[in-house]
Amino acid sequence: MADLSSRVNELHDLLNQYSYEYYVEDNPSVPDSEYDKLLHELIKIEEEHPEYKTVDSPTVRVGGEAQASFNKVNHDTPMLSLGNAFNEDDLRKFDQRIREQIGNVEYMCELKIDGLAVSLKYVDGYFVQGLTRGDGTTGEDITENLKTIHAIPLKMKEPLNVEVRGEAYMPRRSFLRLNEEKEKNDEQLFANPRNAAAGSLRQLDSKLTAKRKLSVFIYSVNDFTDFNARSQSEALDELDKLGFTTNKNRARVNNIDGVLEYIEKWTSQRESLPYDIDGIVIKVNDLDQQDEMGFTQKSPRWAIAYKFPAEEVVTKLLDIELSIGRTGVVTPTAILEPVKVAGTTVSRASLHNEDLIHDRDIRIGDSVVVKKAGDIIPEVVRSIPERRPEGAVTYHMPTHCPSCGHELVRIEGEVALRCINPKCQAQLVEGLIHFVSRQAMNIDGLGTKIIQQLYQSELIKDVADIFYLTEEDLLPLDRMGQKKVDNLLAAIQQAKDNSLENLLFGLGIRHLGVKASQVLAEKYETIDRLLTVTEAELVEIHDIGDKVAQSVVTYLENEDIRALIQKLKDKHVNMIYKGIKTSDIEGHPEFSGKTIVLTGKLHQMTRNEASKWLASQGAKVTSSVTKNTDVVIAGEDAGSKLTKAQSLGIEIWTEQQFVDKQNELNS
């Protein structure tokens, strides 16, 4: 047994060394096959001799049993956000404020990694808990998923009690591989590495997270008691010595001009990095000076985040293609010479509508400027007329639908052209894709390509046909083995139990969004009651406007739609509201029964998180301010809604006041 114990220790040392070389230094000394061989040897030993499995074993990286959900845990110290700077003037004002308070200052400049903030707690040197940022006060416990990240040490080099914070992210090569795999499986692609990292960390099965090859950079320590550091730079050096991965592209500078030089350098070099960054973080380096400056209610006074402007690149417009949405809107899409924008290769971009094409004088063959709106959605910003080649073609939208040949119309007050043929194949397919989407019936495994195959094979002609599919229908399809068929049929069966609001949104009624679907489902509770409702009744409901009311009634009066609903009923698709009615929630008197409007940017939680919490307390969250509004919660840059609330004398809370009230209830 002594020999076996010695071999286990040797395997630990080798696997930890090879893992560090591969994931942290990006300089492996052995091939993947050698690492895999040693890992499987250790797994086998631990299976046969469980007494040799330790909490810091390299086999923990593989992932464990799936969880039912993530627990909510309060942070020992709130994870605050940083104030933002968008230009040189903002940075110089920040510098002036710092110098007025503490005099001469040295800054620490660090890359702002575009990922997900996490907090890691160590007890006696062992990693025991990892949380998401959440709303800054409370995060989700994702410890098992974080253990699969090789850049996070399961055991520190010193037996310290400490909490560190960092940014979990997905390297670009991992992102590309993941999307290639999803494309092969006809699954929805991730828009960017940040979304992919967030989605991977929220997997209930940590084995799936382990396959995603995430990484992390640690950027701060929560308590400096066990550290000899006197500055942020020394703290990062200490973290390196303890086995953490910090970002080495940091710099100490003596003044704001040094900050600007650092920003200029990484603005031009950001694409050379193997991961995405979305800005630069500037901190007062001296820890005593940080303490002297302190915090506001939502951020440290001694730090600021400079946000990069949206990156713009030039490429060639090769062609313009048209797509038809589920409501018949015809949208022009630019076909581009492939170009890298904000870390991903772009070959298609939105042109929105014909008016935009003409207003921006965009012609086929032009050199055009492309950017990603919010670093996510590619769009053509403008053409470059001075580089226009001879023969560049002015684009004109067709007069008839490219899918069904029906005449296109422009409805009064709209800029888009629309196909109004209810039997247009392109619209029907898009409607099917919408029906199975996540916010609708959420049928996992029924992707675009499979739906197109099913439609072309005449196995489905409407959404109800999905619930009539059999194993015999699905097995002959491309890339549909027995396991995928079994999983898909199980997902279809599960979708029958969705609540009424999922079905309403999935039907694709024009103007009826997720929130309005929820409102109608909660109000009428069953589809049968909705079938008898009048337009006059609907417009009386808050959040249901004239357009929505007219559209819903017209849709549900259609005999074909009523036949479709009966067809769904025949397959036992649920048509009853399953949620808890707001009026039935016994929330806190501070919130219960009140109509509340959220406006402006929130920093300590998302608008969606705030809305859900308010609903859980019996409040009704609406989108517009009226005389019936009880409270307006105003975040940063609150605009006309705040002004209207002030004019009506409505009670106004800041985000911090709202958070304080939440904390009072939770205490």
UniProtKB/Swiss-Prot annotation:
Its cofactor is Mg(2+); Mn(2+). Gene3D superfamilies: 5' to 3' exonuclease, C-terminal subdomain, 6.20.10.30, BRCT domain, DNA ligase/mRNA capping enzyme, Helix hairpin bin, Nucleic acid-binding proteins. The keyword DNA damage applies. The keyword Magnesium applies. Pfam families: BRCT (PF00533), DNA_ligase_aden (PF01653), DNA_ligase_OB (PF03120), DNA_ligase_ZBD (PF03119), HHH_2 (PF12826). Residues 586-667 form the BRCT domain. NAD(+) binds at residues 32-36, 81-82, 110, 133, 167, 283, 307. Zn(2+) binds at residues 401, 404, 419, 424. It is an enzyme of class 6 (ligase). GO terms for cellular component: cytosol. It catalyses: NAD(+) + (deoxyribonucleotide)n-3'-hydroxyl + 5'-phospho-(deoxyribonucleotide)m = (deoxyribonucleotide)n+m + AMP + beta-nicotinamide D-nucleotide. Keywords: DNA damage, DNA repair, DNA replication, Ligase, Magnesium, Manganese, Metal-binding, NAD, Zinc. The active site is at 112 (n6-amp-lysine intermediate). Its EC number is 6.5.1.2. GO terms for biological process: DNA repair; DNA replication. One of its GO terms (molecular function) is metal ion binding. SUPFAM superfamilies: BRCT domain, DNA ligase/mRNA capping enzyme, catalytic domain, Nucleic acid-binding proteins, RuvA domain 2-like. DNA ligase that catalyzes the formation of phosphodiester linkages between 5'-phosphoryl and 3'-hydroxyl groups in double-stranded DNA using NAD as a coenzyme and as the energy source for the reaction. It is essential for DNA replication and repair of damaged DNA. Belongs to the NAD-dependent DNA ligase family. LigA subfamily. This is DNA ligase. It comes from Staphylococcus aureus (strain bovine RF122 / ET3-1).
